[in-house]
């Protein structure tokens, strides 16, 4: 034991000395350090943490005492390090590695060319040897669309991860940047894929169509980026299309998305004559040459016809930067012209601060402008050390703690996506702090369950590359970890948890059952998998009809899962008519005085509750409960039962059996019985009181309104106007040279089968997208119809 105490002393002194910057220290010096009042706490901290136990001493018996002490000192020093100290102690090699890492996503409105852009990125970085297009026209399909359904429909359904190395020339020297990339869906029905990608990414490329500019899903993606403070660069794609207008896109980013933006490029040529771009920072021409535009021809000679435009747009760029960056503002006021290096530095600062987005241009399908966009990813988007990632320290009342992407610090990671694989559950993980090694043990902060990591892989769409270790700031996937999406993992030494991603409510449901009873097990297995992988896909069994009900973000969302059941599990299903997820609420105050009194031989049920229900006085959709009971007429132990009863009553409203929102219950008085009162009685009394008072409180059905955006050739404007007048309220109309866009708030109930009507009205040339907007009172005739239908269903079940 004397040896252990001596080594403990050495360890504590060494740890104290390390914190003071001493690199080499003797045993005597360590003892002296521990004895000094200012450093004595290191020894006590060592004792309290019990980092150096007899068992660890025996495990390290082949090491000298000094070596053990040095090892333990490093561990203690690392665990105690502040974020600032960790950053200061980062080795040059580690700092250089992080500076060359980019975790980015590609996000946009549907059909803006995200997957095509990603395919070019993979080709130019050497990750794929040949380019394949979406929809599988060449029999192969884009690399990132690995699902058969994605290739058939030409849409991205699941986000796909990959990684690539981009060689960028900096001051004549070639630097290699490591890019972790996630390609996300553009359809609103798969918005959770974008949501969880944005939760773990450091930056993003927002792709816009040069013809359509900012579209409905662009606005949704912008909102998601802002929710997680994700800096972005913007890429105006499809510059080779007829009617391409990049300046309209730049203007709409400023006005519709409310984020300062300026072009850093000007296109050379237009539409089919697109040749390349002019870099406004260095004032040079960049043209793609050779097969698939692999070679770049760089020239200082700007075509005469666009020279004046380039000078004008460069000045606009500097003026816009002066609005968002202090250094450029100072130079602008002093009428100084910033150098290209100063402009680049300002763009980087403002972009990382989410104050600005630089706009680049090109056409992925025409192999133009993608390489300069990759350079911009490296120049302007943050590395993992540039972003403020925080965890919540549960031991300190969930106080925010900054995480530092330093390999020597204790591990902290977030599981952000789950995927079923032939080899088991694949868990996608973002490593925020520390490093992860194959065979390591981690702790799930939800339940503190210990898990072993048997296999670590880097993903390349549906392909995997095994690795033994992954560093801080990286994205990887692991096998053999039983967890839920959004779980936090640590090495056990930190009581940290990471905030999860936002999950929107489902807006549509339908009943489903397998056609063959023999498929019940496969059906159940598939449903469990889908719910685990997708938080927006939900399932419940209706208590009255005993039907299995699935809920999701829209018709396409549920249709895809029904199709996946058939293809992946060979389960043919019968589905009912889609159902709208209505809500119920109250519009006025109504008092209640309800007495529950039942006797059945033994102890009975007795509970009296008095009070009122009213719309939530604070507004919003939350339900609120309050007790104003005085004099102990209802003991405190029964008040919580009343609250629980109110909450249970709100799960299934009296009008349609849908959720109740925006209501408040206040209990002011009541009565109890010596033997017959119980939690159960007061729970039931609160439920019954709420139900009885609901009608008097002006119970109302709320229906979901969808923000619907329709785009079509201008010649069909009249036809679409007639369609939309029957379904909702037109909010905005924008007419372009060849096409127009209409935005309307439509009742979801009126939108079933709309795609068929739109095809007929536009000869198949129109397209539309929907996203949930808000709940609004249903028209009186619809409410009456829905309530009568619900009452008939209840009556039919009672008579069975």
Swiss-Prot record:
GO terms for biological process: mitochondrial translational elongation. The keyword Transcription does not apply. GTP binds at residues 108-115, 183-187, 237-240. GO terms for molecular function: GTP binding; GTPase activity; translation elongation factor activity. One of its GO terms (cellular component) is mitochondrion. CDD domains: EF-G (cd01886), EFG_III (cd16262), EFG_mtEFG1_IV (cd01434), mtEFG1_C (cd04097), mtEFG1_II_like (cd04091). Pathway: Protein biosynthesis; polypeptide chain elongation. It is found in: Mitochondrion. Residues 99-385 form the tr-type G domain. Residues 1-59 form a transit peptide. Keywords: Elongation factor, GTP-binding, Mitochondrion, Nucleotide-binding, Protein biosynthesis, Transit peptide. Belongs to the TRAFAC class translation factor GTPase superfamily. Classic translation factor GTPase family. EF-G/EF-2 subfamily. Mitochondrial GTPase that catalyzes the GTP-dependent ribosomal translocation step during translation elongation. During this step, the ribosome changes from the pre-translocational (PRE) to the post-translocational (POST) state as the newly formed A-site-bound peptidyl-tRNA and P-site-bound deacylated tRNA move to the P and E sites, respectively. Catalyzes the coordinated movement of the two tRNA molecules, the mRNA and conformational changes in the ribosome. This is Elongation factor G, mitochondrial. The lineage of its organism: Eukaryota, Fungi, Dikarya, Ascomycota, Pezizomycotina.
């Amino acid at each position: 034991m004397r040896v252990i105490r001596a080594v403990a002393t050495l360890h504590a002194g060494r740890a104290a000395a390390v914190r003071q910057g001493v690199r080499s220290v003797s045993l005597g010096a360590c003892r002296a350090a521990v004895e000094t009042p200012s450093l004595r706490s290191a020894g006590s901290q060592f004792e309290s943490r019990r980092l150096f136990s007899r068992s660890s001493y025996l495990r390290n018996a082949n090491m000298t005492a000094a070596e053990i002490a040095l090892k333990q000192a490093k561990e203690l020093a690392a665990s105690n390090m502040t974020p600032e100290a960790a950053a200061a102690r980062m080795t040059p090699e580690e700092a250089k590695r992080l500076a060359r890492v980019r975790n980015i996503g590609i996000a946009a409105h549907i059909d803006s060319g995200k997957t095509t852009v990603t395919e070019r990125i993979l080709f130019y970085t050497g990750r794929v040897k040949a380019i394949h297009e979406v929809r599988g026209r060449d029999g192969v399909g884009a690399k990132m669309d690995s699902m058969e359904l994605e290739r058939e429909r030409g849409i991205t359904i699941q986000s796909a991860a990959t990684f690539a190395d981009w060689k960028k020339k900096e001051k004549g020297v070639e630097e290699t940047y490591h890019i972790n990339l996630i390609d996300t869906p553009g359809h609103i029905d798969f918005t959770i894929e974008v949501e969880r990608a944005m939760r773990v990414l450091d930056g993003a490329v927002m792709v816009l169509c040069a013809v359509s500019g900012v579209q409905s899903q662009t606005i949704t993606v912008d909102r998601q980026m802002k929710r997680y403070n994700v800096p972005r660069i913007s890429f105006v794609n499809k510059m080779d299309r007829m009617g391409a207008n990049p300046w309209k896109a730049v203007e709409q980013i400023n006005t519709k998305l409310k984020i300062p933006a300026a072009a850093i490029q000007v296109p050379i040529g237009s539409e089919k004559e697109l040749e390349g771009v002019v870099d406004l920072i260095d004032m040079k021409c960049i043209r793609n040459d050779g097969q698939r535009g692999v070679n770049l021809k760089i020239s200082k000679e700007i075509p005469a016809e666009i020279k004046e435009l380039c000078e004008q747009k460069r000045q606009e760029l500097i003026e816009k930067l002066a609005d968002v960056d202090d250094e450029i503002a100072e130079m602008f006021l002093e009428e100084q012209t910033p150098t290209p290096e100063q402009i680049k530095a300002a763009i980087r600062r403002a972009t990382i601060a989410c104050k600005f987005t630089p706009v680049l241009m090109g056409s992925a399908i025409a192999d133009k402008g993608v390489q300069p966009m990759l350079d911009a990813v490296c120049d302007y988007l943050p590395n993992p050390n540039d972003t403020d990632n925080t965890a919540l320290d549960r031991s300190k009342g969930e106080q925010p703690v900054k995480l530092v992407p330093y390999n020597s610090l204790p591990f902290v990671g977030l599981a952000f996506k789950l995927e079923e694989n032939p080899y088991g559950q694949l868990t996608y993980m973002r490593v925020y702090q520390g490093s992860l090694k194959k065979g390591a043990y981690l702790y799930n902060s939800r339940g503190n369950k210990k898990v072993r990591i048997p296999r670590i892989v880097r993903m390349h769409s549906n392909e995997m590359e095994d690795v033994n270790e992954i560093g801080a700031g990286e994205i990887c996937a692991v096998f053999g970890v039983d967890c839920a999406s959004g779980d936090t993992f640590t090495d056990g030494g930190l009581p940290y948890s990471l905030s999860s991603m936002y999950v929107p409510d489902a807006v549509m449901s339908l009943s489903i059952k397998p056609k063959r009873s023999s498929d019940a097990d496969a059906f159940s297995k598939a449903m469990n998998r889908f719910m685990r992988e997708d938080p927006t896909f939900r399932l419940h069994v209706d208590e009255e009809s005993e039907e299995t009900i699935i809920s999701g973000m829209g018709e396409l969302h549920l249709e895809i899962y029904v199709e996946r059941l058939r293809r992946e599990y060979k389960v043919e299903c019968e589905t009912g008519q889609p159902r709208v997820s209505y809500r119920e609420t109250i519009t006025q105050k109504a008092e209640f005085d309800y007495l529950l009194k039942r006797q059945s031989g033994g102890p009975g049920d007795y509970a009296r509750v008095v009070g009122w229900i009213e719309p939530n006085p604070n507004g919003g959709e939350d339900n609120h409960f309050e007790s104003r009971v005085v004099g102990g007429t209802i003991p405190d132990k029964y008040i919580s039962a009343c609250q629980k009863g109110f909450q249970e009553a709100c799960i299934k409203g009296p009008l349609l059996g849908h959720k109740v929102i925006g209501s408040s219950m206040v209990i002011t008085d009541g009565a109890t019985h010596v033997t017959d009162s119980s939690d159960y009685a007061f729970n039931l009394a609160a439920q019954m009181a709420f139900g009885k008072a609901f009608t008097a409180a002006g119970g109302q059905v709320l229906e979901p309104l969808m923000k619907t955006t329709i785009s079509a050739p201008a010649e069909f404007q009249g036809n679409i106007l007639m369609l939309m007048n029957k379904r909702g309220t037109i909010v905005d109309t924008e007419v372009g040279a060849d096409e127009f866009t209409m935005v309307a708030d439509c009742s979801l109930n009126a939108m079933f089968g709309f795609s068929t009507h739109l095809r007929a009205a536009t000869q198949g040339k129109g397209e539309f997208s929907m996203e949930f907007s808000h709940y609004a009172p249903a028209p009186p005739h619809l409410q009456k119809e829905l309530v009568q239908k619900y009452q008939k269903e209840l009556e039919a079940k009672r008579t069975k």
